[in-house]
């Protein structure tokens, strides 16, 4: 499949043709396309370059559609300008009023930090060469487990049952609990 994707991209570039490629495979969508259209039940959700859509999803459906491993989804709440995942206050969100939200955190949005604000149960560590995948859990997580990708040079205490993280704000997305539309919180 990877070789086929490479051949399709090579033919597109050589012939300079416009191709409409329909797929449910997000890896194909990300790797072959210059522009993608994400649809849900026949309704267009977002149009953009693969990187734009990944970095700037308009809603929770789009955020969950793109990315391998997938985005980690939590139930969260905004209280007095702070984002809480359970009892963990993880980020300042002064521009957002108090409410319940869905929180999406990309796997690369975690920073391993000994006393980081997000305390998780460590399930296992997977060495992937240049990266390490930390598989953990948290009571507020909607996924069966949290997948965080960190640099392999980071040191993970595998003897511990706990792992703590800080979060990269540009990899954290807030979504309305009812409509699942993204809530802007980082921009002025």
Task: Label each PLM-derived region with a short phrase.
Residues 41, 75, 172:
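Conserved coupling/switch loops of ABC nucleotide-binding domains, chiefly the family-specific signature
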Residues 5, 45-46, 79-80, 149-151:
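Secondary-structure boundary/capping motif
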Residues 49, 61, 75-77, 119-123:
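Residues located in well-ordered beta-strands
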Residues 30, 46-47, 73, 182-184:
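A generic structural signal for ordered secondary structure
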Residues 69-71, 82-188:
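Non-catalytic connector elements of ABC transporters
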Residues 1-61:
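ABC ATPase nucleotide-binding domains
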Residues 55-79, 104:
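C-terminal boundary and immediately downstream tail of ABC-type ATPase nucleotide-binding domains
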């Amino acid at each position: 499949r990877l070789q086929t994707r490479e051949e399709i991209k090579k033919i597109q570039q050589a012939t300079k043709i416009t191709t409409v490629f329909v797929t449910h495979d997000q890896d194909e969508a990300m790797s072959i396309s210059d522009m993608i259209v994400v649809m849900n039940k026949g309704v267009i959700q977002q149009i953009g370059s693969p990187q734009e859509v990944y970095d700037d999803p308009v809603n929770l459906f789009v955020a969950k559609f793109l990315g391998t491993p997938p985005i980690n989804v939590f139930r969260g709440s905004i209280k007095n300008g702070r984002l809480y995942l359970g009892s963990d206050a993880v980020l300042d969100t002064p521009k957002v009023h108090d409410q319940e939200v869905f929180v999406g955190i990309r796997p690369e949005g975690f920073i391993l930090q000994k006393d980081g604000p997000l305390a998780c149960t460590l399930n296992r560590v997977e060495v992937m060469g240049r990266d390490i995948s930390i598989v953990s859990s948290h009571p507020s997580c909607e996924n069966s487990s949290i997948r965080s990708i960190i640099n392999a040079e980071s040191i993970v205490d595998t003897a511990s049952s706990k792992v703590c993280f800080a979060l990269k704000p540009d990899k954290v997305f807030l979504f309305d609990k009812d409509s699942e539309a993204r809530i802007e919180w980082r921009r002025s």
